[in-house]
Amino acid sequence: MKNNRIERLYIRYCDVGLRDNAPVPIAPVDIDTLSVQGKTVIPVVYLKNEIFNSELTEGNSTYISTLAHRLGDYIEQINRYYRLRVSEVQFDCDWSLSTKQAYFSMLEAFKKEYPYQLSATIRLHQVKYREETGVPPVDYGVLMYYNMGRITATGANSIYDRSTALRYLGKLREYPLPLDIALPMFAWGVHSADGQV
């Protein structure tokens, strides 16, 4: 980080999934406080789509506001524990057509209660099909410009594929939200036997 003069860190605070039909934090962060000193920290919370399923949200008028409050409270607990001052929070959710309204409502409830600038991850398909997928009510989005293919035994690059990316970028200039871009800074190996991963 020092050699690359990285000043801003997006740190995954936790995932949120279901346990006993209730949203709970999964794998909370363990931060090396020395490595973040003097850096701008942006907490990132990955929200599994399952927490926005209609069987949880429909007919439960307090589910969304309670979820937003608990997410904010959990983020602030981590900030206090590590003595971090943050001004922005990012939510990462690959929302679907059936969960977008609940997810967007949670973002609005979060913004009403907490003073943070709010960003959200945006996938390529959410840019191309924005009329269907909707645009999250946040200050800006971060376009995830990676994980473009399936992991296969063929050797095709599943992290970045230019031809795949180009199929999704035709409507990028029309996207009504300011976008930053997240580029891949990783690699992985795929082990296969008999054509199977």
Named regions from a protein language model:
Residues 1-28, 142, 147, 156-157:
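N-terminal substrate-binding region of glycoside hydrolase catalytic domains
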Residues 2-5, 35-37, 135-136, 173-175:
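Flexible, charged surface loops at secondary-structure boundaries
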Residues 6-11, 40-43, 89, 140-141, ...:
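Hydrophobic beta-strand segments of well-ordered beta-sheets in folded domains
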Residues 12-14, 43-50, 143-147, 183-185:
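Short loop/turn segments at strand-loop or loop-helix junctions that form parts
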Residues 16-140:
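Chitinase-like catalytic core of GlcNAc-active glycosidases
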Residues 108-195:
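Substrate-binding surface in catalytic domains of secreted glycosidases
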